[in-house]
Structure formats: C-alpha cells, structure tokens
C-alpha cells in the first residue's frame, strides 16, 4: 500500500521539480536586446559591425553607418557619450551598437505572416498608412506600410538598459 501511494506521488513531484528547474533557468537568463546577424545592441562594437557587414556605403556626421544588404539596407547607430550621460549608463558602453534599422525594399511579410496580430507581447499603433508593432521587452519594432513590412528595428531590451545603468 505504501509503495502504491509513493508511486502515485512520484509524477506529481516530478512535474513540480521540472517546473521549478525551468523557472530557475529562464529567470536567470541575461537581458538581451534583439540581435540581427550577430550584431547585438549594447554589446557589439563598431569594429565588429564592420567585420560582420563589410565597409559601409555611408556614414553620417553623428556616426550612423549605412550598409547595403540583401533585400535592402541597414543603418547601425552607436551609443555616444551624450547618451551614456543622459541615461546614466556605464561609460564602457560608449561605442557599442544602440540600434539596428533594417530597411526592406521588397518584403512580402505582413503582420499575419509574422503572426503579430494575436501576439500579446507586441503593442500595436496604427495610422492611416502604417502599423507599428513594438515589443520593448525584447527590443524589437516592426513597421508596416500599407500592410507590407518596411522596417525592422533591433534595439536594447527594457531590462537590458536598466542593467546597463551605473549606480
């Protein structure tokens, strides 16, 4: 009888143990912004971006680099000293990627094809001609113009910025 009772409790305790271990693993994962092609906000430096994407086709006076990629172009902006001061970040973050903006020339992606319409992780904003889906927890923003994907922004996650602050 005691053996039968122990065997009945085993599945219950194993489910609880698995849930506990899973929660522990997922809660200890580091905060990360949305990465693209190995480039990650607040981690990747300018020289690493050039190594990954090649020579830029242009660079603005404030340091935003433009690259031609398959399917469009990409702009990579970097953390500068003003941003570090304004957001009270650690000084070593100056020179890391702030944001990656991928401009799609002929994308056929729609909110439906990316399964964004019922995804509650994304906040939705609409204007007459555009729809924007934002997931700031992951640092990902999609902009659709007349229903077609035009830009994808990869930036830092909310809690990644909080962890980057100096205290």
Predicted region positions:
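Sec/Tat signal peptide C-region and signal peptidase I cleavage site
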Residues: 29-33
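Bacterial N-terminal signal peptides
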Residues: 15-25
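A cross-family detector of function-defining hotspots
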Residues: 44-167
